[in-house]
C-alpha cells in the first residue's frame, strides 16, 4: 500500500527533470507514489521518469514588455492555476515539490493556497526566477549549492546537494590516480551546445601550442556539435594524438572517472557530478546566463580548491596551453584539487532530499528536521 502521492513539478529541461527523477526513484523505494507536473518539453523523458502519471499544466513566463504578450501570459498562468488546483484536489498529494522552471509556478501556488505542504529544490548557487517567486510561500527550500547560513531564507533552507545519477555514484568509487611526466594524461572536455562550439574552436589550437613531449601524452575525450565533427577530427588527426571526438558519449561517467583534468561549463548538474566523482576541473561559466548561475556554481567549487574558474573572454588558446603545461607538470597539484572536489561532493543528496520531503510532508518544521537529520 502506498504511503501517499508525492507531486513533483519541474520545468521541461534536463537540469530540472534529472534531480526530480533521482528523487522520484528514492521516494518510490520508500513506498510513495509519484506524479509529475511539467510542460510538453519533458515528454522526451516520459519513458524513463518513474511516475505513475505525467501531467501537463498550462504555464507561461512573463518576460515580455509587450502588454498584449503580458496579458496572454497572465491568462495562461491563471488557467494553469485552475488546472493545478483541480489536479491537486483530485490526487490529494501529501506534498508538492518544485524543481524550478516556469511550469512549477501554477502547481506550487495552488498547493500553498490549498494548504498542502510544499517545498522547492534549487539546483544552482543563485535562485532562478520561478523558485525566487515561490520561495516566500513554500515551507522549505532545498539547495544544491545554496548556503544554509547565508541564503536569503536561512530559516527554511537546507543544503542537500544535487541528486546525481547512479552511474556517477558508481564512478565515484574509482580513486583519482595522478598522471606523472611521461605517462598518458586523460583530458575530458565538454559543455552544452554553446560550450561545445567554443571548445571546438579553441582546444585544437591550444594543443598545437604544446611542447611535443606534452602533446603525445594527451588522451582527449571531447564533446563537439555534429556540425563541428569534421573540423575538430581533422585538426586532431593532424596533431597525431589519441582522441575520442563525438557529439554525445553514453559512458561519460566512466570517462570522467578516468580523467586527470576536466574542462567544461559549470551548470549545476555538471559541477555536482565532477565533485561527487572528485576530479580537478577548469570551469568556464556560460557568459550569457540570465542569473549568472553558472558563475556562482563555479565559484562555489573553486572556493573549496577543487576547480579553477576562467571567464570565456579570458580563455584564449594560449591560456589553455599554459594551463595544460602547468598542470601536466604538477600531478601533486591536481591530486590536491581532486581531493578538494571530492570533499565538496554530496553523493547522498537524493537520500537527504527524500528525508526532507518526508519531514515536510509530515508537517515537521525545518528546525526539527535540521536537529534530527543524519
From Swiss-Prot:
<comment type="function">
    <text>Cell wall formation. Catalyzes the transfer of a GlcNAc subunit on undecaprenyl-pyrophosphoryl-MurNAc-pentapeptide (lipid intermediate I) to form undecaprenyl-pyrophosphoryl-MurNAc-(pentapeptide)GlcNAc (lipid intermediate II).</text>
</comment>
<protein>
    <recommendedName>
        <fullName>UDP-N-acetylglucosamine--N-acetylmuramyl-(pentapeptide) pyrophosphoryl-undecaprenol N-acetylglucosamine transferase</fullName>
        <ecNumber>2.4.1.227</ecNumber>
    </recommendedName>
</protein>
<keyword id="KW-0808">Transferase</keyword>
<keyword id="KW-0997">Cell inner membrane</keyword>
<comment type="pathway">
    <text>Cell wall biogenesis; peptidoglycan biosynthesis.</text>
</comment>
<keyword id="KW-1003">Cell membrane</keyword>
<dbReference type="InterPro" id="IPR004276">
    <property type="entry name" value="GlycoTrans_28_N"/>
</dbReference>
<dbReference type="GO" id="GO:0051301">
    <property type="term" value="P:cell division"/>
</dbReference>
<dbReference type="Pfam" id="PF04101">
    <property type="entry name" value="Glyco_tran_28_C"/>
</dbReference>
<feature type="binding site">
    <location>
        <position position="124"/>
    </location>
    <ligand>
        <name>UDP-N-acetyl-alpha-D-glucosamine</name>
    </ligand>
</feature>
<keyword id="KW-0961">Cell wall biogenesis/degradation</keyword>
<dbReference type="GO" id="GO:0005975">
    <property type="term" value="P:carbohydrate metabolic process"/>
</dbReference>
<feature type="binding site">
    <location>
        <position position="294"/>
    </location>
    <ligand>
        <name>UDP-N-acetyl-alpha-D-glucosamine</name>
    </ligand>
</feature>
<dbReference type="InterPro" id="IPR006009">
    <property type="entry name" value="GlcNAc_MurG"/>
</dbReference>
<dbReference type="GO" id="GO:0030259">
    <property type="term" value="P:lipid glycosylation"/>
</dbReference>
<feature type="binding site">
    <location>
        <position position="165"/>
    </location>
    <ligand>
        <name>UDP-N-acetyl-alpha-D-glucosamine</name>
    </ligand>
</feature>
<feature type="binding site">
    <location>
        <position position="193"/>
    </location>
    <ligand>
        <name>UDP-N-acetyl-alpha-D-glucosamine</name>
    </ligand>
</feature>
<dbReference type="Pfam" id="PF03033">
    <property type="entry name" value="Glyco_transf_28"/>
</dbReference>
<dbReference type="GO" id="GO:0051991">
    <property type="term" value="F:UDP-N-acetyl-D-glucosamine:N-acetylmuramoyl-L-alanyl-D-glutamyl-meso-2,6-diaminopimelyl-D-alanyl-D-alanine-diphosphoundecaprenol 4-beta-N-acetylglucosaminlytransferase activity"/>
</dbReference>
<keyword id="KW-0328">Glycosyltransferase</keyword>
<keyword id="KW-0133">Cell shape</keyword>
<comment type="similarity">
    <text>Belongs to the glycosyltransferase 28 family. MurG subfamily.</text>
</comment>
<keyword id="KW-0472">Membrane</keyword>
<keyword id="KW-0131">Cell cycle</keyword>
<dbReference type="GO" id="GO:0008360">
    <property type="term" value="P:regulation of cell shape"/>
</dbReference>
<dbReference type="GO" id="GO:0050511">
    <property type="term" value="F:undecaprenyldiphospho-muramoylpentapeptide beta-N-acetylglucosaminyltransferase activity"/>
</dbReference>
<dbReference type="GO" id="GO:0005886">
    <property type="term" value="C:plasma membrane"/>
</dbReference>
<dbReference type="InterPro" id="IPR007235">
    <property type="entry name" value="Glyco_trans_28_C"/>
</dbReference>
<keyword id="KW-0132">Cell division</keyword>
<dbReference type="GO" id="GO:0071555">
    <property type="term" value="P:cell wall organization"/>
</dbReference>
<feature type="binding site">
    <location>
        <begin position="13"/>
        <end position="15"/>
    </location>
    <ligand>
        <name>UDP-N-acetyl-alpha-D-glucosamine</name>
    </ligand>
</feature>
<keyword id="KW-0573">Peptidoglycan synthesis</keyword>
<dbReference type="GO" id="GO:0009252">
    <property type="term" value="P:peptidoglycan biosynthetic process"/>
</dbReference>
